[in-house]
Amino acid sequence: MFLLVSGICPDLYHVVQRFVIYICERRYINKLLLTYLTTNNTRSCILYEDNITEKHSEYSCLCFNSEESPRVVLFDHSRGFWLSHSIPRFPSFPEKGYLYPSSGKVYGQTALCVTYQYAQLLRIVKQLVYLYPRIYNCSVPAVFSADLPQLIQLCEGSRPPQASCRRMEQLSSARGDKFVSFVKSEKYVDDIYTGWVAQVLNADLLVESWQNQGHALPSNCSLPKHAMNIKRIQLPTSIQFQSRYDHSKWCVSRVYEDHVTCLGDLNREKAQLWGGGGLICTYNPVIYKAFRQLVDWYIGC
């Protein structure tokens, strides 16, 4: 499921489509985290985010962050979910209960929550090694130690060895929907959208990302497949805003027939060329239509 969260449209406004919910009522996200806040010793949980200023321990959950966006992974030996989103400093530490940060109420945000079978979650852990996330809460019960030695290393603050500076993994949701995960370490110094994802997926990409740091990367058409910056978003019912008010990070294929949609945690900013992060992509036509129709204006080459 994708969520598009906007801080600039009226509260209580939401439009539900298949796979996609456009919302402004932040408390809906609370329901996604009820399981996280009630974890036990038969589940493993990971949360990660940037700018961590507090350290906590002795809680049956693992929490970690990548370059720009927090993520949550919660699973048992049957299945679990991977929640990726662009909301800074969210979720909060478990003992604080559910808190939605004030910083997430002003700008647009996105979230992607996918349920996977346990075998797929083992693949996800391999992707996390390349992200080398900043873990701020971690729980890997002993029952998982044989399957997840790399996850235990991450929780302990050490970095497992990497075969390269980037990795791509095919994933399948519990219902059978196909996804492609792209992750890069800080050693892959390039724009992930232009230099890698667009070329692998063989599609020109229209990219929405946070470019308010003063060093935005321009639209790039130097390679066979291009990455072009979105500048204006048009939500359903005529809600429109400039990209400078949008903290989300996602892209869609320019050509409708390609049906590519990706949600990520990296901006097209110069500083993030040296950062770890990634994208989760799908060819689902319904999801693509929901995101592609949001593009009101982009900068070509």
Regions inferred by a protein language model and the residue ranges of each:
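PLD/PLD-like phosphodiesterase catalytic module centered on the HKD motif
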Residues: M1-C301
